[in-house]
């Protein structure tokens, strides 16, 4: 029997940009860093307000 190998590429639309060394690349890195910081701040806010519920839900889903 023959086995086939499939190469899968990763995903987003504009993640395939290879030249991130120029000014556009720097701008993109800064935007991604800002978005990441905003998301982490939102997670921190949720945990501060609702840590017990978060932990309970996490444990119920099989987390340790």
Curated annotation (Swiss-Prot):
The alphabetical list of record keywords is: Coiled coil, Isopeptide bond, Ubl conjugation pathway
Name a GO molecular-function annotation: protein tag activity
GO biological process, any: proteasomal protein catabolic process
According to the record's subunit comment, the protein's assembly and interactions are: Strongly interacts with the proteasome-associated ATPase ARC through a hydrophobic interface; the interacting region of Pup lies in its C-terminal half. There is one Pup binding site per ARC hexamer ring.
Its annotated pathway?
Protein degradation; proteasomal Pup-dependent pathway
Q: Which family does it belong to?
A: Belongs to the prokaryotic ubiquitin-like protein family.
Species per Swiss-Prot/TrEMBL record:
Mycobacteroides abscessus (strain ATCC 19977 / DSM 44196 / CCUG 20993 / CIP 104536 / JCM 13569 / NCTC 13031 / TMC 1543 / L948) (Mycobacterium abscessus)
Q: What is known of its domains?
A: The N-terminal unstructured half of Pup provides a signal required to initiate unfolding and degradation by the proteasome but is not needed for pupylation, while the C-terminal helical half of Pup interacts with ARC to target proteins to the proteasome.
- What segments bear the compositional bias annotation Basic and acidic residues? 1-11
Isoglutamyl lysine isopeptide (Gln-Lys) (interchain with K-? in acceptor proteins) cross-link position in this chain?
64
One Pfam match:
Pup
Q: Where is this region: ARC ATPase binding?
A: 21-58
What processing steps or modifications follow its translation? Is modified by deamidation of its C-terminal glutamine to glutamate by the deamidase Dop, a prerequisite to the subsequent pupylation process.
Residues recorded as bearing Deamidated glutamine in the entry: 64
User: What name is this protein filed under?
Assistant: Prokaryotic ubiquitin-like protein Pup
Q: Which residues form a coiled coil?
A: 24-52
Role played? Protein modifier that is covalently attached to lysine residues of substrate proteins, thereby targeting them for proteasomal degradation. The tagging system is termed pupylation.
The protein's gene is named pup
Q: Where is this region: Disordered?
A: 1-36
């Amino acid at each position: 029997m023959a086995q086939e190998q499939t190469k899968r590429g990763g995903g987003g639309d504009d993640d395939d940009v290879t030249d991130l060394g120029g000014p556009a690349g720097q701008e993109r890195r800064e935007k991604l860093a800002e978005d990441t910081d905003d998301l982490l701040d939102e997670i921190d806010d949720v945990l501060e307000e609702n840590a017990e519920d978060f932990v309970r839900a996490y444990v119920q889903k099989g987390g340790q």
